[in-house]
Each structure stands twice: as structure tokens, then as C-alpha cells.
């Protein structure tokens, strides 16, 4: 897929080896089974998939690795795994089980050298830096939040984005915590601030309510890819419908 082709990426939240927000868009026998969901999304023309292990404590790590291996055996499209990736050993384990990319969030911020080491060993194309952002009303700027948006860092978002890029991240998964779950569109200004200052691909996350929103963050925000969870999971829109809308709005997609 060339870089002009825009990607649509469903995201599955995993807890203890199960999909948390059950997927209702297709007649799955078991909507909580990540492998069934992954295969269904691939059939529906997803370009990539993202699995976020939202419990990801060390005792759950083995469940996740087993799951990664199962998904890798069934899936042909690339998939990213994130959640609880804290060390270079975690990166190695997930990639060795067949994931195409790893997404690192809190640990990258706390230890940027992890991005550097991981990208030097495995190549920056495997390393996604996930950044959760909120607009700080007093300071009137976008800032980085950790631990699923619960911990304030006080660091300006683009400043961290630039460092993550310099450290070797090959992509940034940029989530607006303000927009997340609202379904009223992406934060275009946030996206533009990243896409106009960085040369690596930026994946937009947080706010998707319909296919037009996804087209808008690409056309107006410069996003390289869009990530969404609930609008796909609950069958409000299919990936194929979304891509058709994007194509009609002049965006190059893989149908």
C-alpha cells in the first residue's frame, strides 16, 4: 500500500484475552473472541488492526502472547499490539509471536530510550508511539496525559511528538481524550499541529462518529490513517461503507 493510500484501522480493547466492547456488526458466534473479530474485520476490508490490552499487568502477559500468536496465524493484514509494553523484552516477545508493530504509550514517555532501542533493533516501521492528549484550558495548549488519560504530565503534546519521532518512532497514534467517545468528529487543530510539523505518519483517534468525520480528519487534518472502535464494533457503519464515502470525497483507499 503506497503512502498516499489512507488506512482505516479498527481497534479492539482486550481484557484478560477477551474483547471488552463486544462486536455486534456481524453474526459472530462469540463476539468476545479476538480472533473471530479480527477475521471478520479483515473480511470487511480493514487495512490493519490494533489490539490494546487494557489490563496488561504482567500476570496477563502470557494470555496476550498466546492471543497474538493465534491472531497472527489467522490474519493476513498487519496488526499492532499495545498495552503494557514496558521493556525491550516485551517488544521482542510480541513481535516474535507475529505482531507487525508494537504501540508504546506511557513507557515511551517515561523512558524515551525504549523507542530508540526498539527502533534500532527492529526498525522504526515496527514502532508506534501512542500519545493521549487533552487541551489544557488554563495553559491554552495541548498536553500529554498518561495511564489512559488519568495522569497529567504538563508537557506540551507536539514537543513530545517531536522527541518521539527523533527517538525512532515510525508512526504516532494520536488520541484526543477530549473527543474520545463523543462521536462528534476528530480534533482537526490537534491533528494539523502534528501533521504539519512531523514527517512520519500520524494516525487519528478519538471522535469518529461517521465516515464523513474520518474523511474530514484526512482532508483537513492531514491524517495518514484513522482508528476507530465503537462505530465499527456496533455495526453503525461498516468499514466498506466508510471507505466508499472516503473515496467519493476524493481520498485514495483500498476497496
From Swiss-Prot:
Keywords: Amino-acid biosynthesis, Cytoplasm, Histidine biosynthesis, Lyase. InterPro entries: Aldolase_TIM, His_biosynth, HisF, IGPS_HisA/HisF, RibuloseP-bd_barrel. IGPS catalyzes the conversion of PRFAR and glutamine to IGP, AICAR and glutamate. The HisF subunit catalyzes the cyclization activity that produces IGP and AICAR from PRFAR using the ammonia provided by the HisH subunit. PANTHER family: IMIDAZOLE GLYCEROL PHOSPHATE SYNTHASE HISHF, IMIDAZOLE GLYCEROL PHOSPHATE SYNTHASE SUBUNIT HISF/H IGP SYNTHASE SUBUNIT HISF/H. Pathway: Amino-acid biosynthesis; L-histidine biosynthesis; L-histidine from 5-phospho-alpha-D-ribose 1-diphosphate: step 5/9. This is Imidazole glycerol phosphate synthase subunit HisF. Its main location: cytoplasm. Its EC number is 4.3.2.10.
Amino acid at each position: 500500500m503506497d503512502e498516499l493510500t489512507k488506512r482505516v484501522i479498527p481497534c479492539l480493547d482486550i481484557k484478560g484475552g477477551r474483547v471488552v466492547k463486544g462486536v455486534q456488526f456481524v453474526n459472530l458466534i462469540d463476539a468476545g473472541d479476538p480472533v473471530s473479530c479480527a477475521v471478520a474485520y479483515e473480511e470487511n476490508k480493514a487495512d490493519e488492526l490494533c489490539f490494546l490490552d487494557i489490563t496488561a499487568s504482567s500476570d496477563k502477559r502470557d494470555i496476550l502472547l498466546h492471543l497474538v500468536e493465534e491472531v497472527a496465524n489467522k490474519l493476513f493484514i498487519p496488526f499492532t499490539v499495545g498495552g503494557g509494553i514496558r521493556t525491550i523484552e516485551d517488544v521482542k516477545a510480541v513481535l516474535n509471536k507475529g505482531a507487525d508493530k508494537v504501540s508504546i504509550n506511557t513507557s515511551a514517555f517515561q523512558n524515551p530510550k525504549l523507542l530508540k532501542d526498539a527502533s534500532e533493533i527492529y526498525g522504526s516501521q515496527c514502532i508506534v508511539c501512542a500519545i493521549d492528549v487533552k487541551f489544557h484550558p488554563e495553559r491554552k495548549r495541548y498536553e500529554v496525559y498518561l495511564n489512559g488519560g488519568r495522569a497529567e504530565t504538563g508537557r506540551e503534546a507536539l514537543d513530545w511528538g517531536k522527541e518521539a519521532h527523533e527517538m525512532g518512532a515510525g508512526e504516532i497514534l494520536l488520541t484526543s481524550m477530549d473527543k474520545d467517545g463523543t462521536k462528534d468528529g476528530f480534533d482537526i487543530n490537534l491533528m494539523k499541529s502534528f501533521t504539519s510539523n512531523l514527517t512520519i505518519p500520524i494516525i487519528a483517534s478519538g471522535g469518529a462518529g461517521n465516515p464523513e468525520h474520518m474523511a474530514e480528519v484526512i482532508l483537513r487534518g492531514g491524517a495518514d490513517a484513522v482508528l476507530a472502535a465503537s462505530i465499527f464494533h456496533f455495526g453503525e457503519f461498516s468499514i466498506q461503507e466508510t471507505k466508499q464515502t472516503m473515496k467519493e470525497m476524493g481520498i485514495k483507499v483500498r476497496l
